[in-house]
Regions:
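Class II aminoacyl-tRNA synthetase-like tRNA-binding/catalytic domains
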Residues: 2-245
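Short, charged, low-complexity patches
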Residues: 131, 249-257
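Short, charged/polar micro-motifs that form catalytic or ligand-binding hotspots
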Residues: 128, 246-250, 309
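Ca2+-coordinating acidic residues in Ca2+-binding motifs
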Residues: 87, 318, 448
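TRNA-recognition modules of translation machinery and tRNA-sensing kinases, especially anticodon-binding
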Residues: 193, 198, 211-221, 234-248, ...
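Metal-assisted phosphate- and nucleotidyl-transfer catalytic regions
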Residues: 160-166, 171-186, 258-390, 417-437
């Protein structure tokens, strides 16, 4: 049985066996045992006088053991049930002298350095159970709403974002590779016969699938060779990317908002104990901060607030005017001033809008074309595109999406303006030649949603083994 089974279907007075890792061993009598199936540990009461002392000497924090005994109602405070131990088997010893995860509070930085062991702490086991629940809820939402799950390539020859910040994939010996007539590495000699990279997005391929299946989504790892060593960026992260045929920007925003709310609603119900623990953790953390830096709502209240309230929707021009006339901008508190229409909104601007001005999630739409990707549908004004971003408190941008440009001539013109090689996108242009339709989609960064759901502040703490500049340990 798992520890979770014991709490859900309590077989009082029955003999049971459970395996797990020792959290603590107090007074040579009380073992706190956890197997990862639930936040709660089960207390196991040892008969010290009648237990082999060699076994007792090996019951240390981190050791894996098998407990056999009778489940009883607890005689002490703090737990409803406990196991009266009849037999202990040591499955894996753990030397207390050099085990890094001691039963005390560790800094998050220390735990990042020991990412292979940090899941054994209460904080990280809760985070990763919530991550699992969110991932399940994502698939559940799309399945129930008629979407087809598709897989898009990890190795690709196209740059969906047009940013060029991609990891190259090659079998060539770079130090001895053949050069072409322009003194550039000749990738025609490479495995794929051309330059290839790890994907930055599955969007373009998902668009192709949507043109035959209707509504589709892809959910997988993406890679950005962006040299951003911040608490908000990863080089490898997970993206959820739905694409919808016969869908305009308004429909797209409706789906994105509903999707986020339904996923969070599922997690609130599925991960109650983990959220209660993380909520208490954040309340205690808040007490150490100045009053002005404390959260107005606790974690669980924030999640319920998002689920139960409409997101604000404003266009870019409205957002620009709010920011331009804001106190931080007038007093030059923004690192990036907002003075000219067309400026790309930074995280500080996004967070001001959601945390100070509206105090709720915000969807900004109709962005200037010059700061957005080539595939976004041009508006009639010729200056803005049918793009949208969803901004969350504490996070900034959590979703980016758009209505895609379905008109072949307009798309070709845009590709030319941005000096993108049209030959590389021949197949993408084909989608506009043969039965083109209005279509839209968006991308949600899984880790950013998990940040919001757990109250964590560093994106490296919500993925098992973070990949960041100069760091590919584990």
């Amino acid at each position: 049985m798992t520890v979770k089974d014991l709490f859900l279907n309590t077989p009082i007075s029955k003999k049971i066996s459970v395996k797990g890792w020792v959290k603590t061993f107090r007074a040579n009598r009380f073992i706190s045992l956890n197997d990862g199936s639930t936040f709660h540990s089960i207390q196991c009461v040892v008969d010290y006088e009648n237990t082999d002392h060699e076994i007792l000497n090996n019951i240390n924090s981190g050791a894996s053991i098998k407990i056999t005994g009778v489940l009883t109602e607890s005689q002490g405070k703090g737990q409803k049930i406990e196991i009266k131990v009849e037999k202990i088997e040591i499955l894996g010893k753990c030397d207390p002298e050099d085990y890094p995860i001691q039963p005390k509070k560790h800094s998050l930085e220390f735990l990042r350095e020991n990412a292979h062991l940090r899941v054994r702490t209460n904080t990280f086991s809760s985070i990763f159970r919530i991550r699992s629940s969110i991932s399940y809820a994502i698939h559940k939402y799309f399945k129930e709403n008629g979407f087809v799950y598709v897989n898009t390539p990890i190795v690709t020859g196209s740059d969906a974002e047009g940013a060029g910040e991609m990891f190259k994939v090659t079998t060539l010996d770079i130090n001895n590779a053949e050069l072409d007539s322009e003194n550039i590495i000749d990738f025609s000699k490479d495995f794929f016969g051309k330059e290839t990279n790890l994907t930055v997005s599955g969007q373009l391929e998902a668009e192709s699938m949507a043109m035959g299946l209707g509504n589709v989504y892809t959910f997988g790892p993406t890679f950005r060779a962006e040299n951003s060593n911040t608490s908000r960026h990863l080089a490898e992260f997970w993206m959820v990317e739905p694409e919808m045929a016969f869908c305009d920007l308004d429909n797209n925003m409706d789906v994105a908002e509903n999707f986020i709310k339904e996923v969070l609603k599922y997690v609130i119900n599925d991960c109650k104990e983990d959220l209660i623990f993380l909520n208490e953790r954040l309340i205690n953390e808040d007490k150490t901060k100045p009053l002005k830096d404390r959260n107005e709502l606790n974690l669980i209240d924030r999640l319920n607030f998002v689920v139960n309230n409409d997101f604000v929707r404003i266009n870019y021009t409205e957002a620009f005017e709010i920011l331009r006339s804001s106190k931080p901008n007038k007093k030059k508190k923004f690192k990036y001033p907002v003075n000219e229409w067309g400026v790309d909104l930074q995280s500080e601007h996004e967070r001001f809008l959601v945390e100070k001005h509206f105090k709720k999630p915000v969807i900004i739409y109709d962005y200037p074309a010059k700061i957005k990707a080539f595939y976004m549908r041009m508006n009639e004004d010729g200056k803005t595109v049918r793009a949208m971003d969803i901004l969350f408190p504490g996070i900034g941008e959590i979703v980016g999406g758009s209505q895609r440009e379905e008109r072949l001539d307009v798309l070709k013109e845009r590709i030319s303006e941005l000096n993108i090689d049209e030959k590389e996108l021949w197949w993408y242009l084909d989608l506009r030649k043969y039965g083109t339709v209005k279509h839209s989609g968006f991308g949600l960064g899984l880790e950013r949603l998990i940040l919001f759901a757990t109250g964590m502040t560093n994106i490296r703490d919500v993925i098992s083994f973070p990949r960041t500049p100069k760091n590919a340990e584990f």
